[in-house]
Structure formats: C-alpha cells, structure tokens
Amino acid sequence: MIDPNLLRSNLDLVAKKLARRKFILNINKFRQQESLRKILQKKTESLQTERKAKAKIIGVAKSRGENVEFLCQEAYVLGKKLTSLKLENKELKNRIKQFELSLPNIPDDQVPYGFRDQDNLEIMRWGKPGQYNFPIRDHVALGALTNGLDFSNATKLTGSRFIVMKGQIAHLHRALSQFMIDLHVKRHGYEEYYLPYLVNQDSLYGAGQLPKFYEDLFHIQHLQSGTNPYALIPTAEVPLINLVRDVILDEEELPIKMVAHTPCFRYEAGSYGHHTRGLIRMHQFDKVEMVQVVHPDKSMQILEEITSHAEQVLQLLKLPYRKILLCTGNIGFSSCKTYDLEVWLPAYNAYCEVSSCSNVGDFQARRIRARYKGRMNRKARLLHTLNASGVAIGRALAAVLENYQLEDGRVAIPSVLSPYMSDITHIN
C-alpha cells in the first residue's frame, strides 16, 4: 500500500509515477473523498465538543436541583447525530482504504519505462544454448517417451492444465526441489518453512493479492455460510510474508531469510503469454520461494543478492538463462523493481521465465504493519520485503528435459542432481 501521507501531500506526483506503469489514478475521486473526510471529521469534533459542554451544563444544573429534562433531550439528540456521523465517517474511511488498496506500488526510478516485452532491459546472459545434430523434442514429447508425464489422466482426474508425473520424471521433479532447498538453506543462509496451503483473507490482503487478484485465486467456499474464508496459496510468498504481520523486530534480527517449497494454485485460465504448452502454465505447480525481510536502507542491495541466489540454481544445473530488468508496465502489482530470470528452452528456441525476483519496498509492510526498531532510534519504522522464485520447479524440469535430451530420447541427469537421484545417470 502506498503511504497515505504521500497521497495526501503530493497526489499529483504519485499520479505521475503510477502513470509510468499505465495506471490512471483518479485524482478527482481521491480529492473529493479527502475533502468529505475532513468535513466529516470537523463536524464530528464540533459535535463532540458541543456534547461535552452540554454534559457540563447538565451536571451544574443537577447540582442546583434544576429540571434538566429538556437539556437531557438535547444531549440525546446530539448523541444520535454523533453516532450517525461516526458511522458515516467510518464508511467513508473504509471506501478510502479500499481505494488505497487498489493502487499498485510506485515503480523505482531505475525501472525502464515501457509496456511491452521489448521495453524490458536485458542485463546479461549466462551459458550458451546447446547445439543438437538431431531433431529436438519438447518436454511434452520427452515426457511421453519416458512415460513420465501424463496429461491425459490429469485431465480425467481434474481438468486441463494439471499434470500427473510418475516414475523417474516424478523422482527428478522431487530431486530438483530438494536440491533447491538444500542450496538456499546450506549455502545462502535461509531458514526452511513448512506452510499452510490455505490462507485467510487478511493474509491475501497483506501480501497484495487482494483486492486486485481476486479472480485469479482458487477460493474455498464454506457450504453452510456461503462465505470464502480461505483461498489456496498462489505462491509461498503469501504465508511467508504474513509471518511478520503485526510484528516489531529489533534491527539486530535483520535480515529475516525464509524459504519454502509449496504447491501453488492459480486460476489463470487464459492462453496469454509466450508459452502455454506442457508444464509452462499450470493451475497447480510447485515452486521454491525465497523471502527476505530487511532494513529499508538495504533492500536494493538485497534485491541483487536474492536474485543471485536464484541464478545459482540455474548455474549449478548448467542451464542457459538470461536476466531481464522488467519495464514499468510489466512489473507486478506489489513490486517497485523486478528482475526476471528466463531459462533457455531449445524446443521453443526461446527463453521462458523461471524466476521473478522483486523488491516490494514498504508496500506489503504497510499492509501487514511489519516494523522494526533501530539500535539508537527506538521509534518503530516500516520494514522492506523482497521475494524471489528459487525457482519454479515444473519449468526447471521442462528446461532440464529439453537441454539434457539425447538423440535416442533419453535424458541425462545434471551432475548436481546425482545425489538426489540415487546416482542414476539417465532417465530412460
């Protein structure tokens, strides 16, 4: 959530910065709401003062033995007016809050301006795409050859955009997750978490999923009440971030580094995007997610660090990739700056996003009231939060299958995964 004080003091600047990400801030609506809020606040304060004065008059009159029936009637009317005014004020404040919750984060000045993929800035490439002297198969074909990817039965069990994995492919999928978790815990210093896959509305609002992405979530409806108290997590970022909701940390505790492997559930039924075949866009997929909660002065530095942690996954797997700085129109709702890591898929002859690494600044911290106290200045200040996929396991699996394929349809196992694959060298 954007700082409400910044909205009130410099609305035109906020509108200008949000326009860089193609978001039109309704300035007139906000000013009208703010003007009405101030009027209601003054009326409320005036009535409260009048009621207090009336109470004193009644007290004095009673002490003199005077008839106070008429004065009490006036006080009663004032009380009714005040109650009505407070309710009106509360409803207005709720509308203002909903308006503020609908605003995306302000892009950092370093973020390139634009709204198309061509406007993203390529920072670097790592590794060279392999050369093959045989017809390249995509991961769907390789999964069929090795009898490990079963889209047909997944459709029978549930519907489209789900997958059944079995045998050595399922083993490889598990090996990738174990390798990633071990890397981030043992080498990068994260603490591993096991999390609920269902979260409540407060958690979704806190992470910035609501109200913006309501239709992209799988909601769990309570049969008796008809309400949606829970939703399946779209990413482990949601529960991880909310672990510091309503928490005040000491500066010495920072940074907090958390990692989790969870399934993720996203409705996203559209066919938008560059790649939709196979494991690339699923309703259910697994992901290793890293989250850091940091001192506000260090978040841009930590963005480089957390991105490098995701990059090491791809480097150790020896998968060619490129690092992209997203333009203003492509960064996520809560992000102020985002790097995407795109892994090379030979069958597509293109790069495909496998990790998104974002600095969210104080956008989530303001929603969840996550703060810290400094060593010298003990006044509570908002923290900064960052998140990074470390990485999407299904897409990493697709990349391993395609980049390590052999002419006879077998797939070589990356050497770094050997300890997790019972030392087998190939998927047959």
From Swiss-Prot:
Its EC number is 6.1.1.11. Homodimer. The tRNA molecule binds across the dimer. It catalyses: tRNA(Ser) + L-serine + ATP = L-seryl-tRNA(Ser) + AMP + diphosphate + H(+); tRNA(Sec) + L-serine + ATP = L-seryl-tRNA(Sec) + AMP + diphosphate + H(+). GO terms for cellular component: cytoplasm. Pfam families: Seryl_tRNA_N, tRNA-synt_2b. It is found in: Cytoplasm. It is an enzyme of class 6 (ligase). This is Serine--tRNA ligase. InterPro entries: aa-tRNA-synt_IIb, aa-tRNA-synth_II, aa-tRNA-synth_II/BPL/LPL, Ser-tRNA-ligase_type_1, Ser-tRNA-synth_1_N, SerRS_1_N_sf, SerRS_core, tRNA-bd_arm.
